[in-house]
Amino acid sequence: MDIPRIPQRPKRSKSSEENTPSSTPSSTPAPIVPARPRKNNGAAASSEGSGEFPPIPRRPQRKKNIGETDSEADEKPKDAESDEGWNDSEGKTPEKDIHAALKENADSDKPDIGDSEAEKQPEVDGKDPALNLEKALEANSEEAAIPSEDVTEDVTKSEETKSEDIEASVHIEEKVERESEVADTKGDIEVDDGIEVDDAKEVPISELSETDSAFKSEPTDDAANPVSEEAVKPTEPSEDAEDELVLDRESKTARESEPLEAEDVEEQHDQAMEKASSVTQIGETPSDAKISEDTSESNKGDEDVKENVLLEESGSEPKDSETGSPFQVEESAIVPSEGKPPAEVAETSQTTNKSAESLHSEENLTQAKPATVSDQQPTEKQEPSEQEIPKQESSKQPSKPIVPTRPNKSVPSVPKRPVRSVPASSSPESVQESDAKKAPPPKPKKLSSKIAAFQQMFNQPEAVPTAPQHPKSGKLSSEKIGFAANLQNVMGRGIALPGMANPQMFQRASTDLEEETADVHAEPEQNPQVSKAPQRARGPRGKRLPKAIKETTVKVEPRFQLRVASLWQVEFNKPKETEKVDDDLEEDYEVEPEFVDSVREPESDKETVAEPETSTKDDSVQTESLSNEESTSELPEAITTEHVLDSP
């Protein structure tokens, strides 16, 4: 970590060196210029430093101060009372406030009674100023590395001694309360005007002269340009810092009696403005820089008015305490009431000088902010003792906290997917083949049941019946095979012994059985082939034929019909006894002509065939035979023959 350096204090001008007596040491310690508080945690620090005053919360609107009447509140200037007078109007204050403040400064330069009291006032607490200075140096050295909090913590250290001095002076107490309330409501510096103090004390001119001497130590017109350059460029502290501090204190007493010219006032005013601009570059908050710029613009136009008023009122040349006018207007532009006593006017002028001192000390603090312990000690010795640090508290006011900027939302960067690198050796054909292998095979469609059965019929191999082959028992040599062949030629198949079976007969029987079984199995297979005739295409199922037409049976009748009937009939009867037998026999043998004609003629055959019944013919034959019997009654035995021909 780089250690920042503190810029060296600018050298004194020639005019100041000539007027400084080297032998006369400074009789009284110079007052400490109070530092202007920063706006981060100012209210909290002041409440912790002084246990007597509780923290005052912020209020949305400005209210009346404690002990302030309505008439005093109405007499205050509107520009100082409203936020627009300080924030929105570019820091320009009315000329009446500036004239009144300059008049009070002129009145405060007049000698008053009570120089001894003013000399004792910085040491009200009774503490050793050297011890207080060591405490301040330790506090500044511990927090020098933290640039954002060093000023606020220095304020808290100085506020610890504030409470003891406030107990001694009641009028300072009331003013601190009123200024803290105004700062809480405004957020920026506001001014309390016309505050009446019951127990007002006259401030001696010696204290004011001490404050003037602090400002006189600044360079004059001869060193105006080198001061601005050296304030910006940081340099290492010189070894003669202690000697310069002694010479500075000796020169204070001589400068108190030495008046300043109007030209010196203008040059010192310009130097103060340059310092204010350099302070903003080094370490001020944006709000402090804005206030200093606004006040500088408002005060440049009113420089001639200030000088004329000071010369008229004081009757002498203006002193160095009036160089804090640009900051004096910023801190408090007090317009006293017409009926105020001179004691109150002196008090208000004292407060204006203190406010200018506070701003001047703040510039020194901001320049010495990043210093370390070793580099900080020679420059802090140049400041006055810490006895008057409680005076800083009256002008310190809380400031706005510094809000850090919100970090931008960073969009996460998503890395791109790496491209798949194909090796040079692999050709595009091999890549395509590898992709083709990885692809799953296409699934075949499910076939219908008829198509599947049709394919199975062709795929099944035909069963060819093969004759059973009996394995040969053992391996025979060539000699044995030749001997067996010769034996078969001689003996044939061998001689069958009783109880032996002929193997050839057994083989023949087995083959016959297999052929028979194959024929039996083949016959039912042929029948379905015959029955599997090509069927006709069926029509729509809605139009069905009747069963009588569906179940038609075609009968093939033969051309000839066979009929069975009895052709001959023989009857036996007992013959009658007659004497003449021979004559009857001859008559019986005679053939009737009708019978002969019926046999010869084919027409008769046709008629008989057409008539199904033959009972009538039999009757006719019987009648004829009976007639013949009557004729042949004389015969012993009557033999009647009937011949019936049935034609088909």
UniProtKB/Swiss-Prot annotation:
Pfam families attached to this UniProt entry: Aim21 (PF11489)
Subcellular localization: Cytoplasm, Cytoskeleton, Actin patch
Biased composition (Basic and acidic residues): 89-128, 154-189, 246-258, 290-309, 378-394, 597-620
Name of this protein: Altered inheritance of mitochondria protein 21
GO CC aspect terms: actin cortical patch
UniProt keyword Lyase present: no
Basic residues compositional bias, start-end: 538-547
Compositionally biased residues, Polar residues: 347-356, 364-377
Keywords, in A-Z order: Cytoplasm, Cytoskeleton
Region (Disordered): 1-479, 511-550, 571-648
Function (record text): Involved in mitochondrial migration along actin filaments.
Similarity comment: Belongs to the AIM21 family.
Acidic residues bias spans: 580-595
Composition bias, Low complexity: 18-29, 409-433, 623-635
Keyword Isomerase belongs to the record: no
